[in-house]
């Protein structure tokens, strides 16, 4: 389970603090898939970053004993100057992947980037970056995957592949 206790998050503005959450309390079951829906600017991505502990609340806390992915979003998790392959190796190393060559091969196959896998990520389209980040994440075994819009990009076949991958992970 993921427990959110008295979570408060604000950002400074000229009109004073703009609260995203104020004393939010919630328990997320981890045995089910959970969708967080809301309008643009509602705080979904902020919540994901706090769940992943890549951003911290003003007050309150997030409690869990589960391993969690980073928030997989359209533009996150890659270094533009590095190639897709170099980014994959980097992600594998910081997530303690045991066999980097096997991980790299699985990511390359899943991302469907072909020869572009060895080009700098700065040359990729947003869809290609999303494919790479999604492939890196899905080839690491986390208890919980935080997916933020990444399955809405790419061609219809890749979107189907992404949904099937998430379904398989949820059945494990």
Model-assigned labels for residue ranges:
Residues 1-4, 8-31, 35, 58:
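A short, flexible loop at the N-terminus of ABC-type nucleotide-binding domains that lies
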Residues 30, 64-66, 140-141, 171:
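Short loop/turn elements that form and flank the Walker-type P-loop nucleotide-binding site
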Residues 33-35, 39-94:
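ABC ATPase nucleotide-binding domain signature region
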Residues 10, 14, 67, 72-157, ...:
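ABC-family P-loop ATPase nucleotide-binding domains
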Residues 165-172:
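Conserved catalytic loops of ABC-family nucleotide-binding domains
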Residues 25, 45, 125-126:
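Short linear Ser/Thr-Pro motifs
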């Amino acid at each position: 389970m993921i427990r959110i206790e008295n979570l408060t998050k604000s950002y400074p503005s000229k009109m004073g603090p703009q609260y995203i959450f104020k004393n939010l309390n919630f328990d997320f079951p981890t045995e089910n898939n959970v969708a967080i829906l809301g309008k643009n600017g509602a705080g979904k991505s902020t919540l994901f970053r706090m769940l992943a502990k890549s951003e911290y609340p003003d007050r309150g806390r997030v409690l869990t004993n589960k391993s969690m992915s980073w928030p997989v979003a359209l533009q996150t998790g890659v270094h533009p100057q590095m190639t897709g392959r170099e980014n994959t190796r980097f992600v594998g190393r910081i997530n303690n992947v045991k066999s980097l060559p096997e991980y790299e091969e699985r990511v390359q196959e899943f991302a469907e980037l072909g020869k572009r896998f060895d080009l700098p990520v700065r040359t990729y389209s947003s869809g290609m970056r999303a494919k790479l980040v999604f492939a890196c994440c899905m080839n690491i075994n986390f208890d919980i995957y935080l997916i933020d819009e990444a399955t809405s990009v790419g061609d219809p076949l890749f979107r189907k592949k992404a949904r099937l991958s998430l379904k398989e992970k949820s059945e494990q």
